Amino acid sequence: MSEVSEVRVRFCPSPTGTPHVGMVRTALFNWAYARHTGGKLVFRIEDTDAKRDSEESYQAIIDSLKWLNLGWDEGIEVGGPHEPYRQSQRMDIYADVLEKLKESGDVYPAYSTNEEVQARHKAAGRDPQLGYDNYDRDLTEEQIAQFKAEGREPVWRLRMPDNRIYEWHDLVRGDMSVDGKTVPDFVVARSNGQPLYTLVNPVDDALMEITHVLRGEDLLPSTPRQIALYEALVRVGVAKQVPTFGHLPFVMGEGNKKLSKRDPESNLFNHRDNGIIPEGMLNYLSLLGWSLSADEDIFTMQQLIDNFDVADVKPNPARFDQKKLEAINADHIRMLELGDFTERLRAYLEEYKGFPADYPADKFAFAAELVQTRIKTLSDADGLLRFLITSDADLSLDEKAARKNLKEDAVEVLEVAIAQLEAIADGEFKTDVIEKALQSKLIEEMELKPRKAYGALRVAISGAAVSPPLFESMELLGKESTLARLRAAREQTPFAPAQQ
């Protein structure tokens, strides 16, 4: 039997719930390995659980891969030589393979109930919870006839080889071995003939000629069973080979517990909605088990492709750290070309933060440049730029910032600033002119420290202690709004002179 020389990996999630970062990390590592080796990534959907699967979740998985720009070479939406790529559409294929395994004797009918299995264990002095005891392997024709007469319908179990030590080289964990005596014959199809995951997953891998199975370590215990099934599939002409396995480490949450779907950090779309960009997300997910080098955490996707090898993935559990994700995301935001950043920021703010679509493009581009190096996530920009789209009358001052910056001495600062800015011609209200006018009076003549001189002005025009650069912010607001806000702040200070 000829072997497939090209690396072929797969990503095969079940469409349940929202995309989990651990699931996406698995997709990423498969994608990176395929790209690194010049191989192919197959994307299929395992949707045979009618009670849990949903079309909404199916679409969410596709959306998550597209948002992250993780393309695939074969499978859902793009097609390929092994269609269809949804398990629910492949039932005839599984039925045909099951018949071949029945004919070869690799699977057999098992009629024992759980209660009967436990009773036999108990009678033999064994733990009743040991699992199936392989009792039905050698049923006589008379016994089978009796069970049928009772109306029993059998499940179908794979006959595990006797006296076998299962050995394989795991790409992540090294050489592994399991005594086959600890692995009982297992069910591959229900009594109604419906195939189980234990059958359909390896069958799909075999027919799609998957060479490397990279998956979560929660599936590690099933490897001996799958090896035995692959070997049976080779015997009946369905599979060409047993694939190479690599079991990726768990993604952990707080308290060294596995990151569950209940944890907000596990939801990929939460991160997207909170302003994480694809480059930052992928860079961080890559670090959950892999690294470019000991002292290099920031890298591009091309660097990942050039350097990724599954053999370099560490087997130890990786903890999800939200702060580190945001720090890495900040680096990738700064790495974006300004035009690209501006376009992404505008799209994000309009979709998620209600930023007005009619805000002037030239002003937005100016504002985007001011915040690109000051934010960790796109959502941070909303807080920094919100004052630009708030009317003068609706601007509210942060109480803490106002209390700190709008004290008695702020009245004079505000009055001087108003006078200086009023003197600037309307057409000359630009950053450099504003800076010169305020600096000459507040810093050079009054000898105020910049924090004392500009703190009150910043709070007055933005409502907050932190904003984009002050003079640029004034230019963006324009002369009329800037003066209106300075006057309003002067009236709101506790020590403002009484109006006559």
UniProtKB/Swiss-Prot annotation:
Give the species this sequence originates from.
Answer: Corynebacterium jeikeium (strain K411)
Q: Which family does the record assign?
A: Belongs to the class-I aminoacyl-tRNA synthetase family. Glutamate--tRNA ligase type 1 subfamily.
* Entry annotated with the keyword Cytoplasm: yes
- Residues recorded as binding ATP, renumbered to this chain, are K261
Instruction: Write down any Gene Ontology CC term.
Output: cytosol
Instruction: Write out the residue ranges of the motif 'KMSKS' region.
Output: 258-262
What is the first-listed, main subcellular location in coarse terms?
Answer: cytoplasm
Protein name (database record):
Glutamate--tRNA ligase
Q: Which NCBIfam families match?
A: gltX_bact
**Which Pfam families does the annotation name?**
Anticodon_2, tRNA-synt_1c
Locations listed in the record: Cytoplasm
One GO BP on record is: glutamyl-tRNA aminoacylation
